[in-house]
């Protein structure tokens, strides 16, 4: 018997478009650029005192992901850092570009691509009063034919803190400043006021000894 092959190319079903046979089905995809920034912190206890305080290093890992459906370019990062009293602070190093998941040039992100950056901050003695360091980063990129239209403020990467978007990365300072105070007024007259020579906080600076000279 004879074998007859029957073929057909699909039609889009729209006979009002001036093409009634074998025309492709076209779906228009609207550009939707977006990025997501995340900043995670880890403390290096430089003096090994088991406290977060002066001299310790806060190491930041920053990721910027293209979560939209088109490529973005001209990616820039603007860092904002303050202590617990709102006083501005500045990163010690970075942000420094490290790599990207799809090997694009620095500043360019393909769809789904993630760029990685690092930064650090060395805690100062003046930071103790504020009790914490707050840090966030603003990522700014451009979609095709636009400039600086794609932005995101970093999240801290912790989704169990009841704040899943745009929350700053916070490091608490657990170091407590040591004090030493000498009271130079002594009136040993039994009235209950200044009857004894007193040193406060000397236990914070041991071993020690006290010598009194007339």
For each of these PLM feature ranges, what is it?
Residues 175-214:
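Short loop/turn motifs at secondary-structure boundaries
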Residues 1-179:
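Exported/extracytosolic protein signature
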């Amino acid at each position: 018997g004879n074998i007859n092959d029957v073929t057909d190319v699909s039609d889009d079903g729209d006979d009002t478009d001036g093409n009634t046979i074998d025309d492709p089905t076209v779906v228009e995809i609207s550009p939707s650029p977006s990025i997501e920034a995340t900043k995670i912190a880890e403390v290096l206890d430089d003096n090994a005192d088991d406290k977060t305080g002066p001299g310790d290093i806060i190491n930041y890992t920053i990721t910027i992901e293209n979560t939209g459906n088109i490529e973005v370019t001209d990616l820039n990062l603007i860092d904002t850092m303050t202590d617990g009293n709102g006083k501005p602070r500045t990163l010690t190093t970075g942000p420094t570009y490290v790599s990207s998941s799809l090997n694009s040039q620095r500043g360019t992100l393909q769809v789904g691509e993630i760029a990685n950056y690092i930064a650090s901050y060395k805690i100062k003695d003046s930071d103790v009063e504020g009790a914490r360091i707050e840090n966030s980063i603003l990522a700014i990129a451009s979609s095709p034919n636009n400039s600086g239209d794609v932005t995101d403020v970093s999240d801290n990467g912790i989704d169990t803190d009841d704040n899943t978007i745009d929350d700053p990365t916070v490091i608490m300072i657990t170091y407590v400043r040591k004090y030493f105070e000498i009271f130079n007024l002594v009136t040993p007259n039994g009235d209950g006021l200044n009857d004894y020579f007193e040193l406060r906080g000397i236990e914070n600076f041991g071993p020690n000894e006290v010598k009194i000279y007339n």
